[in-house]
Amino acid sequence: MNKKNTTFLNSLYMDFLTENELDLFLKSLDEIWTAELYTNLKQNGLIRHVISKVWNKGQHRITQDFEYESQDSFKKCESILK
């Protein structure tokens, strides 16, 4: 297995008004983040994408962390995700 080093990291916080909205978003992830999309992103330098739910009382938040091979890889993937 060829392990790539992360040289560029992008973190995104997403806040929702209610727990139901957050749950609906989480359920829709398979429709948004398809295998084809991940293949395309990986070919352009995405190393890893992690989605985490934040369990703070009174907050409805997720975080998404994107790890890239380089800043250039980030820019390529950003154009794919627009």
Segments predicted by a language model, with ranges:
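Short S/T/G/P-rich N-terminal loop/turn motif that feeds into the first structured element of a domain
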Residues: 1-81
